[in-house]
Amino acid sequence: MSLDKKTAFITTPIYYVNSSPHIGSALTTVTCDIITRYWKRLGKPTLFLTGTDENATKVIEAATRAGEDPKRFVDGLAAEFQRTWRLLHIEYDDFIRTTEPRHIAAVHEVFNRLRSSGDVVKGLYEGWYCVADETFFRDSDVAEDHCCPNPECGKPLRRIQEESWFFRLSAYADRLKQYILDHPNFLQPEFRRNEVLAFIDQGLRDMSITRSSTGWGIQVPDEPDKVIYVWFDALVNYLVGAGWPDHPERFAEIWPADIHLMGKEIFVRFHATLWPAMLMALGMELPDIIYAHGWWTIGGEKGGKSKGNLPHPGDLAARIAELSGADYEISVDALRYLLIREMQFGLDAEYSETAFLQRFNSDLANDLGNLLNRSVSMAGRYLNGMVPPPQPAPDGYDHLLNNAVTEAGDALGAIQMNTAMEAAFRLVSRCNKYIDERQPWRQAREGDDQAVRETLYTCFETLRVVAMMVQPVMPVAAQRIISSIGLDLNPAEVPWQSVGKWGQCPEKPLPSPIPLFPRIPANLLNRTTENIQESQTTNMSDMPEPSTQPLPAVSVAPFPSNSTITIEDFAKLELRVADVIDCKPVPNTSKLLHLRVKLGEEERDILSGIAETYTADELIGKQVIIIANLQPRKMRGIESQGMILAADMNGQAIILVPETRVPSGSPVR
């Protein structure tokens, strides 16, 4: 961050409004939101700018296809982008549209200043032109088929000759190259920086920055037959968002931008060369960091609007909610996490709905959700539903927490979102392992109440720290975790620097445990949709709410008449409620779990073939219903002393549990 300004300033690119948002644009915008939330936790005033690019020829083409007036068309899509970002818990400060008067006036000011300084000059252009991309190409860039070299376009090029205004980009090549070499963090990641240097070494040509008017776009001052090239126009939005030219005092507090974030396709030619050269010509400071992230790919090829193969983020969040049973707000947070966790920032990543759902189960349901549920459940069982008084940290554990907080903060500051979350979830894994090592159920059974307090206090402190660490990524889920462990505070208001300090969980009563991230059943996990969004070109107001309908009933064959039993037969079964106090997989089998259950004062071992539905960890702390008087049976060298009751849903075992917690050993009538 520049030391002589007060406000941290981050931007997304402004998005073309030729179709609806998808998870590609969501990745960029969510990342900026995460960084902004982190900056706020550091105590920095912030400005987060996003918006829409509405002056391109593509917009007219899309409006024509939709049978709409261009202005009405862009108004509708701009509103949809805003609704989508609000849905994703994105808290931008300013949403700029390039059809706004403030933007048009600033573009005219830039053009006039550069024309007056001799950096914009009139000339004759002759060469290849792509109407769809509004881009001129060198002869060396064009293949023999004379089609657009942009792989997303590929349309036939036109050979044209027309009078145009040119920005003297070539005049800034040496200065720009030297600036990049002198400021190694200016362009990121490093391999993209090298691409820019190679591009400059090929020779920067003066850029045509006007086009013949089609009746849409920003008119060239005093020349109604020409409009300003959409990229020259669009980049100016960053200055406008910072207050230029009408609010110089505000602009001085905000500019230069700390981070421009965008996809790699608009990095080399526009953000990393044209834009810095424009700023140099205007005599303005350059941004601190210009960062290009990778693409979501499908089968190794870029997914996106033109192919319609990336889902709308609202649809994907609804899908997660439908399959998992999590509420919609939590599912949105889960999507935010999955977007940044599935991609190593800067590189491409293959989009797979199945991979997203599998990570939901592994990270959020099995790890974080399970840690929260088992910690609160065991406190309810062993500590009368209370967070214990603060206890000393296990040897080295407080340093472990502090180091993780520091690592995550450093990663967020370096725009490495996945690394930050890896640091948080290592704590989750360590704490789950800590529970297994300490075995609080055994400590309670042996009457070592102090050991139980120490163990569970460590769990609650870990959950507090993890919630604070994931808050920039999952703000709603973080608040739920904090409330679930008895804390009455807003994680967004807790300074990042204070998070790792041990002993901040006071003795307090706990609410009843409610699963935060319910696990997606195995039989639903692979039931992915091929075309998840039907609203790729419709308004979000038309998008249905997440389904609240129950799952369809399972088809069951009629019972034969000779399968009935008498009430006396049923009375022979002794059904009781048991507490699961320990659970582990049975070696060399994929289906069996070895459960240790408590029936009043008695403990038993039971083997159950439910491992394809449940992990061992998520069963600890649950109550189950067992047949208590079943003749013991030895399996895999272990004597099983009962049977757990479970429903069969399409071959998947779903355990039966009491609606509310009851004393262990209670009879089932």
Predicted regions and their residues:
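N-terminal catalytic cores of NTP/NDP-binding nucleotidyl/phosphoryl-transfer enzymes
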Residues: S2-L77, I96-N112, S116-S117, D133, ...
